[in-house]
Amino acid sequence: MKRVITRTALTLALAVVSTASLNTQAQSQAPNAGTEPVLAKELAPARSYGKLTVTSAAFQSGGTLEDKYTQNGDNVSPPISWSRGPAGTMSYVVLTEDSGVNRPDPISHWVIYYSPSNVTALPENTPTEAKLENGAMQGLNVRKAAGFVGPKPPAGQMHPYHFEVFALNKRLNIDPATADRATVIAAMKGHVLALGDISANYTGK
């Protein structure tokens, strides 16, 4: 009787260990489990940790983005301004990213590069053209189109949107047809003199 009980207990113990091992393996293989997106400012930090002050007449930092700047409204870009970069600044890059997603890369809503060093603001409703009148270039957003595309998170979900500005010691000569977020970030690494950002939240409807 004792031998039967011992064998039964051993069998149960092995089954528990095997089940735990399978559960652990399944969790480790779950796609993007707990993944948080990495923002551009973390991928291309400032060389000297310089700071730009970024502001908007449309919202306070950490505030709420109005419907007019989203796909639930007019889908126009908000006005963005920033302080002048340090000595040696030759151009600016402006990126808008949604970090409220469970994936390695944020959703890219706006890519601007080659912005001249004397330009420190973008007006509301910036045209969705590859080249702007001020000389800046607009790369590809999440829709693979030039210019700003507004937020449209799932209904009931609040997502943060980061407007990041980078002062560079060079001009990025990139074809607008290929200038997506990843390409611009790769090109500006090691050339960022200063950066700053402002964020706003929006809840899907």
Where is each model-derived feature located?
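N-terminus-centered regions that define maturation/targeting leaders and the start
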Residues: 22-205
